[in-house]
Amino acid sequence: SLLKEDKPWFAYVDLDIADQAEENYIKSLAEIDQQIDDTLASVSLDNTIVIITAEHGTTFNKLDEKARENYFGRDEIQVPFIVYWKDLPVQEVTKLTSHTDLLPALMSSIFKVKNPVSDYAQGRNLFELNGDPWVLASNFRWNVIIQPDGTQYHIDRKGNYKKFDRTYTEQSSSRPPLGLFLDVFKQERSFVNK
């Protein structure tokens, strides 16, 4: 069988959970858990890296389409992020992370790449986080800096600015933290320029 042969094998399962009531969502999660279990039972974990994550979370807030597209509440941006490989020690990362942190983790910890992370990725190694003070999320309109305490700073291309606290309540703030935005965009631009 293809799955038991000693050849490289890759699988990508694109699961799309429709916008449903909470109880149907929970039922869908149980079905996904079973699909993951079935998939893992069909491959040899001796030479397999398993990564389980999601593009975004699910909010049950009543939002219209435009509000949903621009929503960065914790329920929407916090996702599962599980990495398994037989030679990785079991650990739980509780610091603020981003999907951009996966590639540096794989390249440094599994594939033993010695180049500086900045040569090939924007993120940080998940397994060697050193307390960086923010992650960046974005959509077609907003760039959002998220700090470990949950504070979010949103800015768009037209200079529109919003600040939210950890509960995603908009805060009164007339001046964006320009130094922080400049640091973030400088770091992002330095990677693109390479």
Question: Model regions: which residues?
Answer:
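A long, amphipathic alpha-helix that forms part
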Residues: 2-9, 17-50, 64
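Extracellular/periplasmic catalytic domains that process cell-envelope and extracellular macromolecules
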Residues: 3-7, 45, 73-77, 138, ...
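Histidine-centered active-site microenvironments of extracellular/periplasmic hydrolases
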Residues: 47, 53-88
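Structural recognition of the beta-strand scaffold that forms the well-ordered cores
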Residues: 10-14, 52, 83, 135
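Feature representing long, continuous alpha-helical segments
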Residues: 30, 34, 38, 79, ...
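Catalytic metal-binding/acid-base residues of hydrolase active sites
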Residues: 16-18, 56-57
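Membrane-interface soluble catalytic domains
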Residues: 85-194
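Extracytoplasmic/periplasmic, Sec-exported soluble proteins
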Residues: 21-31, 73-74, 91-98
